[in-house]
């Protein structure tokens, strides 16, 4: 039977310390529910004493029914030279009424003398007394040995005495923290092994930060050395360069090292979970993130794609479906017939690989990419291009003209933008105008306003991202630009692209494709 490794998620506390991340109370509740559903064992909800929002979260969480996770409150040891029962910070941990409390304490002698301004002996007393006191009120106490690896390298005997004080106080887990993120994997392994040799029966955990970009490797090495609890965050979010990324650690432990981590069927929810958290914090998931990124199983080169389609093991380390991701064969100027044949099948088009039509399509795509088009992030435009080539996209409207005006008067703080659009649907003409925050916003609003009377479903459409890139910078103000637009209707997301020497025209092309793609998909589903 596989050995168990317990996952301790600190997204709601350590993750919130990342620059640009701020969780609302509702965000925290939604993420906690998602983590529990996924099968996480411990969810660190926050620090009730330091943050009023965390206090509210723990009050709300009392009414939540966790089926897999133990909710955990986070805090610190008592203050120096103070009775533990009189420390309001410690009392706040008890009032949180969680089954588990995690406290951190100093394990680096430098921090004890220079940061805490107390003696090494008093620090040991603080740890022992706080753990012992909390054990009277909660089921489980986890002790985070802050800066443990730096402390061990500075004064190994004292760092071990810190763990001993926590264990004597009744700590259920002692967690070795690489707080500054500067320890390398071989050091993590050696030091964790020494800890396990010294405290054979102790439950040991690892808490790694990613400052040296080794947090995932450090976590795995600690487990190989005997640690059985791993701390981290979804997508590796956290202070400075982040925490250990649970989206890599969990599949590595379960699929590669054979540990029992979460229910196997839940592993398929990993990509969904990663995207959910990315959406909540409004930070796009990096395309190249291992296991869960959009490009994690993407194949661009023709040789690679051809081999993968014959046998996926040739260029994939796991089946992407195991983590809820999917294989992606991209079409680009590097792509060959295999890529395009596969993509056509995805779009429901069967074609002979030797067909002259396929050659024409490849040539067309390569010519467009030479002009500056880029379809890897704009699969909706690619699907429309292919289906138009085969006459499979109907004309949802006939475009006549658009005009965009930008005006600023002397007394205006900001310019105003107005767009007019003239088009017809099945012979019925429509001429509309709209204002916007900028020219593209105005054009988008005018186009949708003209079409919504005929296609009410377009009210669901939202533009969620807009990027402009100069393709040939040396041309200065005459440079060609590529516009990428990401859209959603609440059910799906898609990307479209436009290229022109005029940014308004490039945006129009991408906007038009976004709307046509939405209408085409709705018609395919019978809801237009």
From Swiss-Prot:
<dbReference type="GO" id="GO:0009097">
    <property type="term" value="P:isoleucine biosynthetic process"/>
</dbReference>
<keyword id="KW-0100">Branched-chain amino acid biosynthesis</keyword>
<dbReference type="InterPro" id="IPR054691">
    <property type="entry name" value="LeuA/HCS_post-cat"/>
</dbReference>
<keyword id="KW-0028">Amino-acid biosynthesis</keyword>
<dbReference type="InterPro" id="IPR013785">
    <property type="entry name" value="Aldolase_TIM"/>
</dbReference>
<dbReference type="Pfam" id="PF22617">
    <property type="entry name" value="HCS_D2"/>
</dbReference>
<keyword id="KW-0412">Isoleucine biosynthesis</keyword>
<dbReference type="Pfam" id="PF00682">
    <property type="entry name" value="HMGL-like"/>
</dbReference>
<dbReference type="InterPro" id="IPR002034">
    <property type="entry name" value="AIPM/Hcit_synth_CS"/>
</dbReference>
<dbReference type="GO" id="GO:0009098">
    <property type="term" value="P:L-leucine biosynthetic process"/>
</dbReference>
<dbReference type="GO" id="GO:0043714">
    <property type="term" value="F:(R)-citramalate synthase activity"/>
</dbReference>
<dbReference type="InterPro" id="IPR013709">
    <property type="entry name" value="2-isopropylmalate_synth_dimer"/>
</dbReference>
<comment type="similarity">
    <text>Belongs to the alpha-IPM synthase/homocitrate synthase family.</text>
</comment>
<dbReference type="InterPro" id="IPR005675">
    <property type="entry name" value="Citramal_synthase"/>
</dbReference>
<keyword id="KW-0808">Transferase</keyword>
<protein>
    <recommendedName>
        <fullName>(R)-citramalate synthase</fullName>
        <ecNumber>2.3.3.21</ecNumber>
    </recommendedName>
</protein>
<dbReference type="Pfam" id="PF08502">
    <property type="entry name" value="LeuA_dimer"/>
</dbReference>
<dbReference type="InterPro" id="IPR036230">
    <property type="entry name" value="LeuA_allosteric_dom_sf"/>
</dbReference>
<comment type="pathway">
    <text>Amino-acid biosynthesis; L-isoleucine biosynthesis; 2-oxobutanoate from pyruvate: step 1/3.</text>
</comment>
<dbReference type="InterPro" id="IPR000891">
    <property type="entry name" value="PYR_CT"/>
</dbReference>
<dbReference type="GO" id="GO:0003852">
    <property type="term" value="F:2-isopropylmalate synthase activity"/>
</dbReference>
<comment type="function">
    <text>Catalyzes the condensation of pyruvate and acetyl-coenzyme A to form (R)-citramalate.</text>
</comment>
<feature type="domain" description="Pyruvate carboxyltransferase">
    <location>
        <begin position="5"/>
        <end position="271"/>
    </location>
</feature>
């Amino acid at each position: 039977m596989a050995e168990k490794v317990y996952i301790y998620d600190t997204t709601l506390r350590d993750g919130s310390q990342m620059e640009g991340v701020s969780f609302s109370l509702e965000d925290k509740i939604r993420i906690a529910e998602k983590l529990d559903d996924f099968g996480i064992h411990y969810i660190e909800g926050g620090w009730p004493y330091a943050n009023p929002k965390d206090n509210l979260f723990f009050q709300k969480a009392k009414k939540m029914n966790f089926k897999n996770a133990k909710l955990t409150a986070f805090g610190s040891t008592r203050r120096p030279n103070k009775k533990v029962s009189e420390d309001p910070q410690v009392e706040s941990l008890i009032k949180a009424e969680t089954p588990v409390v995690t406290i951190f304490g100093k394990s680096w002698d430098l921090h004890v003398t220079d940061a805490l301004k107390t003696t090494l002996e008093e620090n040991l007393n603080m740890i022992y007394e706080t753990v012992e006191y909390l054990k009277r009120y909660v089921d489980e106490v986890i002790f985070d040995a802050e800066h443990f690896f730096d402390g061990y390298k500075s004064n190994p005997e004292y760092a071990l005495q810190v763990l001993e004080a926590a264990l004597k106080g009744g700590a259920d887990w002692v967690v070795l923290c690489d707080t500054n993120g500067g320890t390398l994997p071989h050091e993590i392994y050696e030091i964790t092994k020494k800890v396990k040799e010294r405290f054979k029966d102790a439950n040991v955990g690892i808490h790694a930060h990613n400052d040296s970009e080794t947090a995932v490797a450090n976590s795995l090495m600690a487990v190989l050395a005997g640690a059985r609890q791993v701390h981290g965050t979804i997508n590796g979010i956290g202070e400075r360069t982040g925490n250990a990324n649970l989206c890599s650690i969990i599949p590595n432990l379960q699929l590669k090292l054979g540990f029992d981590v979460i229910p196997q069927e839940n592993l398929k929810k990993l990509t969904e979970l990663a995207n959910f958290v990315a959406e909540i914090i409004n930070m796009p998931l990096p395309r190249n993130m291992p296991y869960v990124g959009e490009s994690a199983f993407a194949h661009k080169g023709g040789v690679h794609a051809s081999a993968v389609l014959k046998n996926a093991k040739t260029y994939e380390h796991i089946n992407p479906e195991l983590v809820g991701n999917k294989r992606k064969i991209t079409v680009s100027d590097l792509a060959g017939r295999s890529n395009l044949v596969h993509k056509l099948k995805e779009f429901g088009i069967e074609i002979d690989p030797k067909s002259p039509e396929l050659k024409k399509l490849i040539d067309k795509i390569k010519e467009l990419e030479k002009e500056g088009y880029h379809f890897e992030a704009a699969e909706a435009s690619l699907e429309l291009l292919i289906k138009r080539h085969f006459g499979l996209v109907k004309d949802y409207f006939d475009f006549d003209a658009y005009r965009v005006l930008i005006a600023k008067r002397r007394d205006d703080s900001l310019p105003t933008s107005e767009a007019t659009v003239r088009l017809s649907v099945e012979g019925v003409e429509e001429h509309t105008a709209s204002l916007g925050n900028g020219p593209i916003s105005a054009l988008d609003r005018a186009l949708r306003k003209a079409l919504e009377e005929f296609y009410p479903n377009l009210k669901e459409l939202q533009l969620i991202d807009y990027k402009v890139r100069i393709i040939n910078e040396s041309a200065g103000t005459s440079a060609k630009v590529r516009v990428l637009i990401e859209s959603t209707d609440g059910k799906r997301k898609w990307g479209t692209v436009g290229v022109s020497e005029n940014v308004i025209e490039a945006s129009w092309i991408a906007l038009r494709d976004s709307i046509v793609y939405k209408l085409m998909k709705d018609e395919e589903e019978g809801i237009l």
